[in-house]
């Protein structure tokens, strides 16, 4: 275990941030969303990941596709937000594409002079697990499938393919993305920062376990105060982190996925997607309100930490071997990726 934290410059230095983009985010799997976000033919949704604009579509053959959200004529961004359409049309010069990514029309050009294969939308590799869609910008292999298999084994018999997508919330937070990750990776702060959450979970049962490229926190829930559907055999909460920035928050009847998207060295977006099993509308609203309360408490503390890291009065801290092994494990992962290139 690392006993000392990363020094404060790791949370402020633009050069380190650029190295993270190059050596970590460009080589990692990223969570794009769920197939439930594009349930119908013609549906599309967009997202920016590692400063790259992405489209997810369900085409007329009912096939899921992932592309760069960029017109191949002059590089204009094609789509915004989400919607349903029979084609993708560039608002700059009018080139159109099929939802499969194939070039449909090239306004201003003779059809026989355009190589339609060359100018189709650029595809991105993707992988689907329990209806969750992961993408990767390069073809290097890594252990995502092994990680997901381990998670699947731990949480069985849960199957998120049976859960329904409800909503997405995006929070812009004034902190380095690692500040948010560090905060997520320990429950040490819960009694002080999250008083209501502390009554929902059984804090004495809280445990952390680390693996190669992911970690798990889990605890029992207090049945008298938990807002979740649970039984004697199903009263646990799990918090999985797939490095560098994919989070699964699992409670009985509910899945939240979070992705932490760096904006720059001192700001990040946190994207929450909510999925529910067969629970009542009342329970869904209670869960969302409760989650928003916890998130706002985390935002407050993370932004305070970012301000403190700028101080001349702090450079490097120390980890608790009992409560902060997840943070230590993550920071070791980050430093090794950067230092080894």
Which residues make up each language-model segment?
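Short Pro/Gly-enriched beta-strand edge/turn motifs at strand-loop
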Residues: 27-39, 106-109, 239-244
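Rieske [2Fe-2S] iron-sulfur-binding domain
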Residues: 38-139, 145-153
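Non-catalytic accessory segments flanking enzyme active sites
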Residues: 10-49, 54
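Short, solvent-exposed coil/turn linker segments
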Residues: 7-9, 20, 33-34, 115, ...
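C-terminal catalytic domain of Rieske-type non-heme iron oxygenases
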Residues: 57, 63, 69, 127-128, ...
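Short, contiguous pre-domain boundary segments
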Residues: 1-10, 161
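Generic structural signal for secondary-structure transition and capping sites
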Residues: 25-29, 76, 189
């Amino acid at each position: 275990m690392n006993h000392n934290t990363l020094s404060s410059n790791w949370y402020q230095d633009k050069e380190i941030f650029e190295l993270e983009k190059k050596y970590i985010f460009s080589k990692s799997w990223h969570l794009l969303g769920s197939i439930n976000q594009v349930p119908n033919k013609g549906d599309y949704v967009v997202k920016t990941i590692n400063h790259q604009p992405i489209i997810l579509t369900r085409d007329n053959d009912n096939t899921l596709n992932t592309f760069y959200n960029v017109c191949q004529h002059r590089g204009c961004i094609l789509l915004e937000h989400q919607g349903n359409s029979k084609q993708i049309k560039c608002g700059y010069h009018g080139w159109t594409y099929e939802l499969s990514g194939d070039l449909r029309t090239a306004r201003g050009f003779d059809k026989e002079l355009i190589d339609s294969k060359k100018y189709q939308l650029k595809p991105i590799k993707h992988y689907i697990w329990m209806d969750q869609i992961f993408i990767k910008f390069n073809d290097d292999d890594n252990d995502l499938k092994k990680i997901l298999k381990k998670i699947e084994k731990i949480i069985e018999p849960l199957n998120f393919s049976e859960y329904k997508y409800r909503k997405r919330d995006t929070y812009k937070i004034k902190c380095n993305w690692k500040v948010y990750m560090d905060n997520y990776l320990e429950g040490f702060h819960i009694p002080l920062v999250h008083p209501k959450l502390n009554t929902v979970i059984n804090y004495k049962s809280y445990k952390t376990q680390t693996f190669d490229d992911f970690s798990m926190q889990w605890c029992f829930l207090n049945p008298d105060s938990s807002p979740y559907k649970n039984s004697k055999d199903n009263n646990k909460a799990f918090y999985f982190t797939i490095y560098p920035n994919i989070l699964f928050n699992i409670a009985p009847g509910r899945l939240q996925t979070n992705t932490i998207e760096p904006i720059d060295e001192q700001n990040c977006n946190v994207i929450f997607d909510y999925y529910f099993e067969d629970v009542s509308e009342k329970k869904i609203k209670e869960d969302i309100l409760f989650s928003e309360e916890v998130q706002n408490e985390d935002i407050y503390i993370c932004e305070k930490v970012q301000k403190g890291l700028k101080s001349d009065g702090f450079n490097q801290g120390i980890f608790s071997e009992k409560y902060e092994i997840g943070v230590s494990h993550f920071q070791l992962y980050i430093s090794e990726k950067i230092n080894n290139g």
